[in-house]
A protein has these predicted regions:
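A Lys-centered signature of the CheY-like receiver
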Residues: 110
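Non-catalytic signal-transmission and effector/linker regions of two-component phosphorelay proteins
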Residues: 1-15, 99, 113-127
């Protein structure tokens, strides 16, 4: 079994797309991801921008708020899944806010802590 330090090393340098419409939560995500050794690829505050960033690529995984600017993030999740890019959902509503076909994907509750975010990201990379 790998140590926590070894697992965390697997996040070092990973480029993350953050899809979050609330500025303070996006800033918290950026801070926590940085502490985990990740690099922020971009922050998208709406679905069209997120889809354009997914199309352009250049990142290793994504953190997706389930509700972005009054829209569901599922088109972005579908685009990521089609490209085999790992992702984590973030929601204050728990699993009940997810579509059935995405309930097997890692979910981190909001507000999230560094520990919970780290575990969810590692789970996404392992899928």
């Amino acid at each position: 079994m790998q140590s926590i330090d070894t697992l965390t090393e697997s996040l070092n340098g990973k480029r993350v797309l953050v899809v979050e419409d609330e500025a303070l939560i996006a800033m918290l995500a950026e801070e926590l991801l940085g502490e985990l050794g990740c690099v922020i690829h971009a922050v998208a505050s709406n679905i069209p921008k997120a889809l354009a960033l997914v199309e352009a690529g250049g990142f290793d995984l994504a953190l997706l708020d389930v509700n972005v600017a009054r829209e569901r993030v599922f088109p972005v999740a579908e685009a990521l899944a089609a490209r085999n890019i790992p992702f984590v959902f973030a929601s204050g509503y728990g699993e009940q806010g997810l579509r059935d076909d995405f309930k097997s994907r890692p979910l981190v509750g909001k507000p999230y802590s560094g520990d919970h975010l780290e575990k969810a990201l590692l789970a996404a990379l392992a899928q």
